[in-house]
């Protein structure tokens, strides 16, 4: 069984019933009396009722969604730099690295992954310049993005719980290092719904060179109904497979087939209340039917002007793929899609620069710089900027020490790294928090991944302590059970 099959079979045993459901349905007679009490105390009936209500609820928000307070943003784009970009080579300039070049780091941290030897402190090979009126320092890796320095809020004090890729990607997306939790996009769709009943509310575009380590768990709905999971779009070839109706099948014939299928599925669902996978399947058939018209128009980039295609870099081989992702993202946002995630890096070609960090980061920054800057300019020009939240970052950062010989790279570093936010509700032109003198550890206004999630939810009008989902008798939250905070410095 491949990963995708395992991922969506994890909450359902082969017989189609959980152990508790089996005992409930077959534990009749006097023996059922203590069983009823046991199941009641275990939260089984409450869970079944809640699951049935949620599973049958549409993700389409026909009116203004209910929020906990006034939202500053309505939609999100998450630029995910898979592999872990180096903070000291992108947005966290450290002059002390030149001063201490060639020296051993003595900060007392347990660093390095897979037992690799810790190298010597190494300054960035890229120059940094103060950009915009704010004077925010941006690496020469980003000549286009630097023009929007006054719009960026760089959080330089990020940290997470693991230096390993798969759990790191999961934590950045779901708040947990273990598989089976709902992703950020799922939580937002659960809390706010989608604004377009003919398009998915949560879209993911991975790198054609390979998907993220950990697979579909990064956009899974976890223990939520499956209808909230991300929908995968492709950035090369057909954006969505099987989008067109097969030859010889009329729209009327297809509609009648879908209506019959829905009737049969609804009858089956009535016997299995709370079976979210089936409820999601019913909704997905209807969505797929609507997308045959809607999505065909959305993914048709021939409707864009030559100037727009050129601005996003679609005519240059190195920027064409990420440029297409960013342009598709804008078209999806315009049509009410709530959350779009765009991956950079995949397979052996990611930001995971254990060797030759200079060439690695130069390559991946060049692929993404112009497209991201073009999307920012486009959103501003089209009046979407003020209520669209942009997020940039990876699963962790990299060490300020070198790794390897010849053309050295940098190792994983989860103790301190950088991410940036921009757009709706964000105070741009500033850096929040700080790492130590050499960029190893977050020391000032430290921001855990779950603090970032709390801040994102806040900008979307949701209280991270009040946005909950009942699972196994517990009110689950994206931000987890530990005390978390909203980064007030980020807010405009």
Predicted segments, located by residue:
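Ligand-binding pockets and gating/stacking loops
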Residues: 1-492
């Amino acid at each position: 069984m491949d990963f995708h099959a395992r991922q969506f079979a994890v909450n359902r045993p082969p017989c189609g019933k959980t152990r508790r459901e089996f005992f409930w349905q077959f534990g009749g007679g006097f023996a059922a009396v203590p069983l009823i009490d046991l199941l009641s105390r275990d939260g089984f009936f409450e869970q079944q009722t809640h699951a049935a209500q949620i599973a049958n609820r549409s993700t389409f928000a026909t009116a203004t969604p209910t929020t906990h307070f006034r939202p500053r943003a309505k939609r999100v784009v998450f630029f995910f730099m898979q592999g872990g970009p180096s903070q000291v080579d992108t947005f966290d300039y450290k002059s002390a690295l030149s001063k201490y070049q060639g020296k051993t780091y003595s900060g007392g941290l347990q660093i390095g992954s897979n037992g690799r030897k810790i190298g010597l402190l190494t300054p960035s090979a890229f120059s940094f310049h103060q950009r915009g009126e704010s004077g925010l320092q941006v690496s020469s890796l980003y000549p286009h993005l630097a023009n929007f320095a006054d719009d960026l809020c760089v959080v330089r004090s990020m940290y997470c719980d693991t230096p390993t890729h798969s759990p790191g990607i999961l934590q950045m997306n779901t708040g947990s290092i273990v598989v089976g939790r709902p992703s950020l996009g799922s939580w937002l769709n659960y809390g706010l719904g989608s604004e377009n009943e003919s398009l998915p509310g949560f879209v993911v575009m991975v790198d054609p060179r390979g998907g993220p380590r950990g697979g579909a768990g990064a956009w899974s709905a976890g223990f939520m109904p499956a209808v909230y999971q991300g929908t995968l779009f492709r950035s090369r070839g057909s954006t969505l497979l099987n989008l067109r109706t097969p030859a010889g099948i009329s729209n009327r014939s297809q509609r009648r087939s879908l209506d019959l299928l829905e009737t049969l599925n609804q009858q089956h669902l009535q016997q299995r209340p709370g079976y979210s996978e089936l409820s999601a399947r019913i909704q997905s058939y209807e969505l797929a039917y609507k997308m045959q018209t809607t999505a065909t128009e959305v993914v048709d980039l021939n409707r864009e002007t030559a100037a727009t295609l050129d601005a996003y870099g679609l005519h240059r081989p190195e920027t064409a793929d990420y440029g297409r992702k960013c342009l598709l993202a804008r078209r999806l946002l315009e049509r009410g899609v709530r959350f779009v995630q765009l991956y950079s890096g995949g397979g052996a070609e990611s930001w995971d620069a254990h060797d030759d960090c200079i060439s690695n980061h130069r390559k991946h920054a060049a692929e993404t710089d112009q497209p991201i800057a073009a999307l920012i300019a486009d959103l501003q020009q089209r009046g979407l900027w003020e209520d669209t939240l942009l997020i940039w970052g990876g699963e962790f950062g990299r060490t300020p020490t070198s790794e390897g010989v010849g053309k050295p790279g940098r190792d994983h570093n989860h103790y301190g790294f950088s991410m940036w936010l921009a757009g709706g509700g964000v105070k741009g032109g500033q850096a929040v928090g700080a790492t130590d003198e050499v960029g190893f550890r977050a020391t000032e206004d430290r921001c855990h991944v779950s603090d970032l999630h709390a801040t994102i939810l806040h900008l979307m009008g949701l209280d991270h302590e009040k946005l909950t989902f009942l699972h196994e008798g517990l009110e689950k939250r994206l931000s987890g059970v530990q005390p978390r905070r909203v980064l007030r410095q980020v807010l405009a």
